[in-house]
Amino acid sequence: MAKQNLKSTDRAVQQMLDKAKREGIQTVWDRYEAMKPQCGFGETGLCCRHCLQGPCRINPFGDEPKVGICGATAEVIVARGLDRSIAAGAAGHSGHAKHLAHTLKKAVQGKAASYMIKDRTKLHSIAKRLGIPTEGQKDEDIALEVAKAALADFHEKDTPVLWVTTVLPPSRVKVLSAHGLIPAGIDHEIAEIMHRTSMGCDADAQNLLLGGLRCSLADLAGCYMGTDLADILFGTPAPVVTESNLGVLKADAVNVAVHGHNPVLSDIIVSVSKEMENEARAAGATGINVVGICCTGNEVLMRHGIPACTHSVSQEMAMITGALDAMILDYQCIQPSVATIAECTGTTVITTMEMSKITGATHVNFAEEAAVENAKQILRLAIDTFKRRKGKPVEIPNIKTKVVAGFSTEAIINALSKLNANDPLKPLIDNVVNGNIRGVCLFAGCNNVKVPQDQNFTTIARKLLKQNVLVVATGCGAGALMRHGFMDPANVDELCGDGLKAVLTAIGEANGLGGPLPPVLHMGSCVDNSRAVALVAALANRLGVDLDRLPVVASAAEAMHEKAVAIGTWAVTIGLPTHIGVLPPITGSLPVTQILTSSVKDITGGYFIVELDPETAADKLLAAINERRAGLGLPW
């Protein structure tokens, strides 16, 4: 495959693209080519559809029209568009969290018998952080108060959002408060963005962007809350060994992919699938093989060792194997095309949420009150599909990688405690100080069809690891790295610099692994970016410095979704240099671009690094880490 035509660096995906071409199946890459040339006004953020006088578009070269019909400038139009993306992303993550809050509430009230408190320790830790009394209280009563506190954080109230003010270092909360950036309520901030960006409201670009920063913290609250509540209900992840890539599918099994984001559905599917093995065998299968796609795949991977099939932009490839019997969907990052592809592959596509249906898919409404019954109904559809598929040819790439995952914040602290039980963070801090660990980089976000799949993630990670940067990853960024072997401990010698190698080996051996931790630590799904925040906040608190002084950076190397926009923005807002590897729709306004890549540093300490070349991006991330080290008086 010629380099200029490279669609994916994943060999399994390349094999399926060849199959799709032979069979005349249109994929996401074909649709991207058909869409070219894409609208330059949209790409630069210079189009506006916020009222019925439009659409308006601004000339990017300085000629007329220089303002919209209402008089909105390029700066205002670009800032409003960015704000709405942040709000949409926050709505996604916080909707996920709200779903979990309602599920926890139903569980402890006896209305959803399939769910229970799985992690009592995490429950008590969260309650203590929120100021909820636990002494002498029943776990169910504590959990109910946690659920109520979570739901209260969605509304405007006199007290600020707890899932912001109690999770960040006090020094960071002070900075954010001084600039009016602490959200009053998650839903409140989303609604206010929609209000202030409507026609006739906020027409000051800097003020609009400050509103966007505040709304992004509502997204952080949704992420952190989603992680907390999922851990209470389904357990806090601990290290687990599994596999990834299309090779995890099995020709002779009922192959079921859970796809989307919320473990409320996928965790039950995993549990019930074990009960239905005999039904699958009676249909002629060897059993039920549950695999994951995207973030709900990450959820069940890190808690149950469920293998990851594929991620993000390549989700259609699982179906093109011909071996996928059912794709079970909840919400977010699901391409509507899966229903069309299913017509070619025979896969049964099953939607489960009232707010996320797809024309052509089978809908089974999933209710927590009837979770087991709904799961059985869904899995029987998969078994029926297998009966129709049995005996037909399939093409499953013989490609898969070993994955060691499940590195929640608690798991990392526990691993470090084997080196220093009294002060678990000290070994990490000592190795940052002595240079064995140069800094930390969080890889987050999606794949984007505009970038050869996984290329940016793997190129940047490879360079950072050689420079002794500790790499953690979430979401489909984690998926990209796992499918290329970055989460296999056997690859530490090849991928890591000597200092990082020594640290990973010392921790692994202290924990009885007989070898190192993997080169990249998988911290979970996209909401689990909160785990990285928890880790760096603990480091900041331990050192007595704010987040904007730590040698910590983030990269959304192949960002696609509005949720990635929100995540990147709150990373900047809490003080992190944050790389974006695709062109964001802000370049139509030089002032907006300058604010986000430079001036915002004076407010939050963080800033965006927009760099499409992955080699150069790695250099810029290293430079940001070195600058932070110098600021702390550390050698680099």
From Swiss-Prot:
Its EC number is 1.2.7.4. One of its GO terms (cellular component) is plasma membrane. SUPFAM superfamilies: Prismane protein-like. GO terms for molecular function: 4 iron, 4 sulfur cluster binding; anaerobic carbon-monoxide dehydrogenase activity; hydroxylamine reductase activity; nickel cation binding; peroxidase activity. It comes from the Bacteria. It is found in: Cytoplasm; Cell membrane. It holds the Pfam family Prismane. [Ni-4Fe-5S] cluster binds at H261, C295, C333, C446, C476, C526. It is a peripheral membrane protein. [4Fe-4S] cluster 1 binds at C39, C47. Keywords: 4Fe-4S, Cell membrane, Cytoplasm, Iron, Iron-sulfur, Membrane, Metal-binding, Nickel, Oxidoreductase. [4Fe-4S] cluster 2 binds at C48, C51, C56, C70. Coiled coil: none annotated. It catalyses: CO + 2 oxidized [2Fe-2S]-[ferredoxin] + H2O = 2 reduced [2Fe-2S]-[ferredoxin] + CO2 + 2 H(+). Its cofactor is [4Fe-4S] cluster; [Ni-4Fe-5S] cluster. Its main location: cytoplasm. GO terms for biological process: generation of precursor metabolites and energy; response to hydrogen peroxide. The keyword Ubl conjugation does not apply. CDD domains: CODH. Gene3D superfamilies: 1.20.1270.30, 3.40.50.2030. Inactivated by O(2). CODH oxidizes carbon monoxide coupled, via CooF, to the reduction of a hydrogen cation by a hydrogenase (possibly CooH). Cluster B is an all-cysteinyl-liganded 4Fe-4S cluster; cluster C is a mixed Ni-Fe-S cluster which is the active site of CO oxidation. Cluster D is also an all-cysteinyl-liganded 4Fe-4S cluster that bridges the two subunits of the CODH dimer. Belongs to the Ni-containing carbon monoxide dehydrogenase family. Homodimer. This is Carbon monoxide dehydrogenase 2.
